[in-house]
Amino acid sequence: MTTFTDAAPLLIVMLLAVLAPVVSSLSREIKLPFVVVEILLGILAGPHVLNLVSVTPSLEELSRFGMAFLFFWIGYEIDFKRLWGQDLIRASKAWGISLMLGVSIGLILKQLDVVNSALLFGLSTTTSALGITVPILKDREDMESPFARAAVAMATTGELAPILIASVIVIENGNPQPIDIILLVSLVAGLVGATYLATRMTPPAFITYLRAQIQTTSQLPIRLASLLLASLFFLTGSFGLDAILGALAAGIILGLLTNNEAGDEIKGRFESIGFGLFIPIFFITTGIRFDLTGIASSTTALIEIPIFLMILLITRGAPTPLYKDELNIEERRTLAFSSATALPVLIALTDIGISTGIMRTEVAASLVGAGVLSVMIFPSLMLRYRSHRAD
C-alpha cells in the first residue's frame, strides 16, 4: 500500500516542477532557464536547506528513469542529416582537443594526488548538456543560426563521445565477457550504419501507420518507443555497460526511424511526457540530493568546485577558435559557455567512477558541484550574450 510518507515527496517534487517555469518566466534581470530553476528549487526544498523533502527509494527510481528519458530525448533530438558533414567533423576535432587538454590537466592533478584516474577526470571535463542547450535555443527560436549549428554539434559530441568511452571504462574495470565487447561494438556499428542509411533512404512506410495510431487511445507509437527504451536500457545495464548508453541509443534509433514530417507529432508527444513529468523529476531530485551543507563545511570542496568549474570552461572553450570563420569573437565566447554547460553526462560519469572505484567520492561530489554551478551560470551568460546580440 502506498502511504502518505511515500506520496508526499513526489507531491512536493511535482509542485516544484510546476513552480519552476513560472519562476523562470518572472526573472527578468537574471535570465535563468527553467532547468536551472528546477535544480535551485530542489536545493532549496532539500534536506540541507528547508528540509521539506528528501530522496526516497521511489523518488530515486523515478529520477533514474527521468535521467534515462533525458538521454533518450537527447538521442531522439540529434539530427544527423543536419550535422552530417563539416559541422560534425569540426565539433569532433574540438572535442578531441578538449579531451587532450582535460587528460593533461588530469595528469597534473594525479601527480598532486587529487584524482585517481586522469582519463576519467579528463573525460568528465569534456561533457556538454545537449538537453539544456537545445531547449534554450528552441525557446529563443534560434535553431537555424550558424551559432546554433555550432552549439548543437559541440553539445552532441560532448554527449555521445564521453558515454561511449565511459562504457569502455566500465568494461575494462569489471569482469568483461566477449558478449560485452560484442554488444558495445554492435551498438556503435548499428548506430553508424543506421545513420548512414537514414541520410540516404526514405523512412519506412509504417511511420504513416504509427501516425494514425497516435490519434487513438492505444498510443501504439509511444508504447513501442517505451519498449525500445526499456529494452536497450535493460540490455546495456545487464551486460555491464552504462545503461545510459542504451537510453541514448534508443533515442537515436527512434529519431532516425521518424525523421520526417510524420514523426513531428510523435516527437511532440515525447516532449510532453519527458519535459512535463520525468525530466523535471530528475533535475529537481539532483538539487535535493545536492549536499550544500557538506560542501559549505568542506574546505577542500570549496576550493575544488570553482577550480573544476574553470577547468570545464577552459577545456570546452579552448577549441572555439576552430569556428573563427563562422562566428565572431563574441559568438565564440558564447559557444564556450554553451559547450561548458555540463551535468547529466557528468553525473553519469561520476557514478561510473564511484562504482568502479577509480574516482574518489569527494572528487565526484566536487565535479557534480561544478556541474550544478555550470548549469546555473553558463546558460544565463549564454542568454545574456545572445540577447545582447539580438538587441
Predicted regions, residues:
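Short helical (or helix-break) motifs at transmembrane helix termini and adjacent helical loops
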Residues: L99-I105, T125-I165, L312-L322, T341-I352, ...
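Juxtamembrane helix-boundary/capping and inter-helix hinge elements in multi-pass membrane proteins
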Residues: L32, Y76-L88, K110-V115, I136-R149, ...
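Alpha-helical transmembrane segments of multi-pass membrane proteins
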Residues: A17-P21, I43, P47, W73-G75, ...
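Entry/N-cap segments of selected transmembrane alpha helices
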Residues: A8-V22, D79-A118, G122-L123, P176-V192, ...
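Hydrophobic alpha-helical transmembrane segments in multi-pass integral membrane proteins
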Residues: A7, L50, G102-I108, E159-N173, ...
